Amino acid sequence: MTNQIESYAAVGLSPTVYGVQKREQIKMNIDHLHSVCKAACWLTSLDLPVRLIVIPEGALQGFTDEVFDMDHQKYVEDIAIDIPGEETNLLGQLAREFNTYLVASAKARETEFPRLFFNSIFLINPQGEIVLRHRKNSPLFPVEHSVCPHDVWDKWTQ
């Protein structure tokens, strides 16, 4: 006999995204995501409870590094986030408020690689905790400036 989970709705958002020049500006996109999540959860939950919200790539920071061909180190210093960090804490508040899992992505720093950023995706549970994290393995060359694990493989596998 199998245990079947209760039916639920998943919401994929397509928010307006503002390309940021400084990390502090990311909060503007997160505030907008809150409004979009609120509307989407209200409307979608008329049928089934929303248990999963997916935020698209670029929704936190935009694609400033790609559009303006930014220097990698400048992006690390000015825009890349920490996971966990201030921005993921704000997203965790959204997950708690709407009692849902939340998938998001961001270009983020790694403690072991302080001068690099990775394009990371992460899953936040309804308690606001990051429970899964993945780094993009195949950035779109030549436009994506993020590093992938293959670029630093020897140190990555230590």
Question: What is each of the regions a protein language model found here?
Answer:
Residues 4-26, 54, 120, 133-135:
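Active-site-proximal beta-strand elements of phosphoester/diester hydrolases
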Residues 17-28, 69-70, 80, 145-150:
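Acidic/histidine-rich helix-loop elements
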Residues 20-21, 64-78, 113-123:
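Surface-exposed, active-site-proximal loop segments in enzymatic domains
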Residues 26-39, 84-89:
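Well-ordered, non-membrane alpha-helical segments in soluble/globular domains
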Residues 36-72, 95, 102-103:
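Active-site beta-strand/loop signature of hydrolases that rely on acidic residues for catalysis
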Residues 74-89, 154-156:
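A short acidic, glycine-rich active-site loop
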Residues 82-109:
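A short, hydrophobic beta-strand-centered structural micro-motif
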Residues 109-158:
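Active-site catalytic loop in hydrolytic enzyme cores
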